[in-house]
């Protein structure tokens, strides 16, 4: 990293440890949106990390952005994930939005600290299998109307705008019918069931939401139909997930290292760190995390200059490795620490819960391995199967 990039990462690391990490357990217990942490990140410019400098944002390159998300995740996984989802919406606006949409929505973030959610998941569809939307957007004389149900609606009741993934009425080929719509959170007809009592990632607050006759202005439609899967942004969801996974696992290992150095056992009166068995476990975990970190950093460094067909493989390999390594590390840390690792006053159990939960986000391990294998064989590099056709690229 250049000195400028490193300074950005160090700034968010300080903010994370001073302000964000101390709140993580409270937001986790409450299952509530981390609004104070969002406010702090906005004040320091990080809600505008993916917004171009011309619009007042930080304009971070992908390598720096991924390092920022990873750093936040070490302190609070839910805060990191919500900021990543919001930032990806900013990338969609930058990629397919009109000049007026960019001016208006970027200003909402830069000047007013507004957050944007991205809602694509649906109850009857597995995005790891097929990219298909059953939520319908239809035109009427006064604009557009949205009807449907969305699952895992991250930042519900917290974000100011929701980017809703819809299908044009009557459309089944998502390459032609997929339509993104930016909807204000206070639009009439939006109802949440309020249910989000999960194993982990509790502060992402992601209940189900029903849209009943929700009106969307014509200037709220983002991009042409099908554009969302043609501009190289959808793949960046998975790259950011990988950064969150790695940050969570790193926080778990950091706790184990601190514990092993400080915990003294009798009758030898020596630190746990002196035990060769513990040393071997720590060595295994450290080596695995280093390997996953290198792959993630390489994918991020290559991202901005990559061809669209390269983005899926870059994201898949990073997400796959950080998933497998992260799950192993967060489980093994509790084994190394022992009973204290199960106490909620310590961060290991939250890391275990958060990692196990957020690694369920698509694409799944099996789908990633399939895609990585096809790429290695010179076959299809698509990250998602698009309903209505087998796309050569997402």
For each feature predicted by the language model, list its residue ranges:
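Glycine-rich phosphate/cofactor-binding loops in nucleotide/flavin-utilizing enzymes
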Residues: 339-394
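Glycine-rich beta->alpha junctions and the first turn(s) of the following alpha-helix
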Residues: 196-289
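C-terminal helix-coil-helix/basic helical segment that borders enzyme active sites and/or dimer interfaces
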Residues: 21-29, 290-321, 334-342
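Glycine-rich phosphate/pyrophosphate-binding beta-alpha loops
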Residues: 151-156, 237-241, 358-361
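A short core secondary-structure module
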Residues: 149-191
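Glycine-rich flavin
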Residues: 35-43, 47-154
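Alpha-helical scaffold segments that form or flank carboxylate-/histidine-based iron centers
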Residues: 235-238, 271-285, 311-321, 349-357
């Amino acid at each position: 990293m250049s000195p400028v990039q490193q300074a950005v990462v160090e700034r968010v690391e300080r903010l994370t440890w001073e302000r964000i990490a101390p709140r993580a357990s409270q937001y986790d217990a409450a299952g509530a949106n981390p609004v104070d942490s969002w406010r702090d990140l906005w004040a320091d410019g990080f809600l505008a990390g993916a917004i171009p400098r011309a619009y007042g944002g930080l304009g971070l390159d992908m390598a720096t952005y991924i390092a920022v998300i990873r750093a936040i995740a070490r302190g609070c996984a839910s805060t990191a994930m919500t900021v990543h989802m919001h930032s990806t919406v900013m990338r969609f606006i930058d990629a397919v939005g009109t000049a007026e949409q960019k001016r208006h929505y970027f200003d909402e973030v830069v000047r007013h600290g507004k957050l944007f959610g991205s809602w694509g998941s649906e109850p009857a569809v597995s995005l790891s299998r097929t990219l298909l939307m059953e939520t319908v957007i239809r035109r009427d004389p006064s604009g557009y109307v949205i009807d449907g149900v969305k699952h895992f609606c991250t930042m519900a009741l917290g974000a100011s705008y929701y980017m809703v993934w819809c299908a044009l009425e009557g459309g089944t080929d998502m390459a032609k019918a997929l339509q993104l719509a930016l909807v204000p959170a206070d639009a009439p007809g939006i109802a949440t069931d309020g249910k989000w009592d999960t194993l982990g990632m509790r502060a992402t607050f992601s209940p189900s939401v029903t849209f009943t006759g929700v009106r969307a202005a014509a200037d709220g439609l983002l991009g042409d139909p099908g554009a969302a899967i043609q501009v190289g942004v959808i793949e960046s969801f998975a790259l950011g997930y990988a950064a969150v996974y790695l940050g969570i696992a790193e926080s778990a290992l950091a706790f184990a290292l601190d514990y092993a150095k400080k915990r003294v056992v009798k009758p030898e009166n020596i630190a746990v760190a002196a035990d060769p068995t513990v040393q071997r476990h720590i060595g295994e975990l450290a080596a695995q995390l280093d390997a996953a970190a290198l792959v993630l950093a390489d994918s991020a460094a290559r991202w901005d200059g990559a061809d669209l067909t390269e983005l899926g493989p870059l994201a898949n390999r990073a997400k796959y490795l950080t998933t497998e390594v992260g799950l192993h590390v967060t489980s093994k840390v509790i084994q190394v620490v022992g009973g204290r690792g199960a106490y909620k006053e310590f961060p290991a159990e939250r890391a275990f819960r958060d990692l196990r939960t957020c690694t369920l986000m698509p694409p799944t391990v099996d789908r990633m391995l399939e895609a990585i294998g096809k790429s290695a064989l010179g076959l299809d590099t698509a990250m998602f199967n698009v309903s209505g056709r087998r796309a050569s690229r997402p």
